[in-house]
């Protein structure tokens, strides 16, 4: 973990950072999420898919790697009938890419910011189905694990978890932040980018702790209620 930037003893501040990220997403703004230094050691710029703008897609293309990914739940992936990109995933962190997609209508080459936005909107529409999309394309869906960051500490799961916690559609767009020379941005550059653009910055581990703190009391209350109900019916 990037402990020099986010000491574990600052748990209250960590929770506040996650809350700030959720507020930003609700307001249609972006957030930055970093993972462990021993994992991918990268920062992803993340936007809510439901409020995504052409300008935000252009920023992902300009400031990041340009590989714009749409993070979806397993249910959404099945509804869109998107098979995984490969049947035998041998990537180090088991990132669950599906086949790439394009909107079936309303796009030209599919690669422009406007076209990629059209594709994303087509994929997340309430009535979206397999016929709304062509395959392959220039947007890369990622399937999140059902348990979110508690099951897999990845940016895909962090994105979907953040959207759910913010009360938004459980789908978001991410792209890895890069430096002007094309190299991957590391923590000093990610922090500088966050400050320059006013994007809240959190770690995956902070999101894990946020979920544990927020969900554990609810789970205990439910268990107590179930126990009390069992005693009453005994």
From Swiss-Prot:
Note accompanying the cofactor annotation: Binds 2 divalent metal cations per subunit. Magnesium or manganese.
Residues that bind Mg(2+) 1: 40
Cofactor annotation: Mg(2+); Mn(2+)
UniProt xrefs under Pfam families: DHBP_synthase (PF00926)
GO biological process, alphabetically ordered: riboflavin biosynthetic process
Keyword check for Kinase: no
Protein keywords: Lyase, Magnesium, Manganese, Metal-binding, Riboflavin biosynthesis
Top-rank taxon, per record: Bacteria
Alphabetical list of InterPro entries matching this protein: DHBP_synth_RibB-like_a/b_dom, DHBP_synthase_RibB
GO molecular function: 3,4-dihydroxy-2-butanone-4-phosphate synthase activity; magnesium ion binding; manganese ion binding
One GO CC term on file: cytosol
Annotated positions binding D-ribulose 5-phosphate: 39-40, 44, 152-156, 176
Catalytic reaction(s) noted: D-ribulose 5-phosphate = (2S)-2-hydroxy-3-oxobutyl phosphate + formate + H(+)
EC number(s) given by UniProt: 4.1.99.12
Binding site for Mg(2+) 2: 40, 155
Feature type site, description Essential for catalytic activity: 138, 176
Main function: Catalyzes the conversion of D-ribulose 5-phosphate to formate and 3,4-dihydroxy-2-butanone 4-phosphate.
Family: Belongs to the DHBP synthase family.
Subunit structure: Homodimer.
Protein name per the record: 3,4-dihydroxy-2-butanone 4-phosphate synthase
Organism of this sequence: Pelobacter propionicus (strain DSM 2379 / NBRC 103807 / OttBd1)
């Amino acid at each position: 973990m990037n402990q020099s930037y986010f000491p574990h003893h600052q748990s209250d501040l960590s929770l506040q950072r996650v809350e700030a990220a959720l507020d930003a997403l609700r307001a249609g703004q972006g957030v930055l999420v970093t993972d462990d230094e021993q994992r991918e050691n990268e920062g992803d710029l993340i936007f809510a898919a439901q409020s995504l703008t052409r300008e935000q897609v252009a920023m992902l293309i300009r400031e990041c790697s340009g590989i714009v990914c749409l993070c979806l739940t397993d249910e959404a992936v099945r509804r869109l009938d998107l098979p995984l990109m490969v049947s035998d995933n041998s990537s180090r962190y088991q990132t669950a890419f599906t086949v790439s997609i394009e909107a079936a209508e309303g796009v030209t080459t599919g690669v422009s910011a406007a076209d990629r936005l059209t594709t994303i909107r087509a994929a997340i529409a309430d009535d979206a189905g397999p016929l709304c999309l062509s395959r392959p394309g220039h947007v890369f869906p990622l399937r999140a694990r059902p348990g979110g960051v508690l099951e897999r500490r990845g940016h895909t799961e962090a994105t979907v978890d953040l959207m759910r916690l913010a009360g938004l559609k459980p789908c978001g767009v991410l792209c890895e932040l890069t430096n002007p020379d094309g190299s991957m941005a590391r923590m000093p550059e990610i922090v500088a980018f966050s400050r320059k653009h006013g994007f809240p910055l959190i770690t995956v581990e902070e999101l894990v702790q946020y979920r544990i703190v927020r969900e554990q009391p609810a789970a205990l209350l439910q268990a107590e209620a179930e126990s009390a109900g069992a005693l009453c019916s005994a």
